[in-house]
Amino acid sequence: MAGRGERGMVGIVVHGSGGPLELLGVPADAALTPFAGSYRFLDLAFATLANSRVRTPAATRDARGPQAVPPPHGRGGGAARVLEALRRLSSGSRLGGITTVAVLSADHVLQVDLREVHTLHRDLGADVTLAGLPVPFGEREPRTMLLAGRDHGLIEVRRAAPTAVANLSWAGDLLVSTRAIPTVLASSRGASGASVLTRLADRLRVIVHDVVDASLPGVGHAYWHEPTSIETYYAAQMDLCGQRPALDLFNPAWPLPAAPGQLGPARMGLDDGGHAAHAVSCLVADGVVMRGGYAATSVLGRGVVVECGAEVEDCLLMDGCHIGRGAHLRRAIVTAGAVVPDGAEIGWSVTPEWAQARASGLTIVAPRLRLGTTEDGESSAIGA
């Protein structure tokens, strides 16, 4: 966005590590996780910085523009990635005139106006401000849970399932005062996970900002999504297809530029009989081709092809997958590059041997799951 940057603050984005979405073929770098067809977690993190008018430091920019900080070697958690990013920033950047650094972890989605968080950080004299994400009702997966006092001060950190008392999670997003960075790095040596935050709270003024109290220009509320399971990842994207999605992808006051790509626009064509393609309450990315067929309440990623006679309902179709003629799909996730054969039925009755039915009612179609039979009777991967 044009305009003067938020005074005294710079922001960096940190790559993430793989997690519960590995079955879907999501890259080991979770920052590249596709979302809403046209985005990656990485793009949405940079949109938060840009819309908040937070500049990125010169050390994290190149000819292509702002770049995310690579993760540390090995599979470090959120705290390890944040600490490595601060270590690199403090050793390779000039932070003269900068009082605060915002760190966003790109293994989830957080759309919040960082200017509001910065104001709270300053007004309460915080050294570190953690973005606390309210856990959606019914989610029980363990995560880093925060307990804060009435003054926002951090009281307790633990790796656990959410409770009625502690229902704010931390996914790796924070603001830190530059004066506190040396103490943050020194205090965290030899610690990992939740113990890092516990040590910091013993030595510094650490507060928690409940993002449910935050807002976005044009809509009045912040947005967050932490993909703790395949089911939560699916549900978040089905919500975006609804009439009142939690995140407005078309808010002119908070623009969300799509990931760069080289595909042409989507094309809704006719089938062999002249019947038009229909996509109702869908998110349709660049390069999608529908040759007739019908899609409802679904996300169609880049380069997806839907052949004539196919029907897709409540589905997540990831980049480059192919839905064959007359195939019927309901409540399915078709992973990137996968091929659903002509006439296949997914999510209706018997699950084909090349798909995986889950207890939640979802069906996954992924290359490593799909085994078909060739004409000579030998087993082969369909679409692999």
Model-predicted segments: where are they?
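Unchanged
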Residues: M1-C241, W354, A359-G361, V365, ...
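Left-handed beta-helix
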Residues: M1-H15, S188-A384
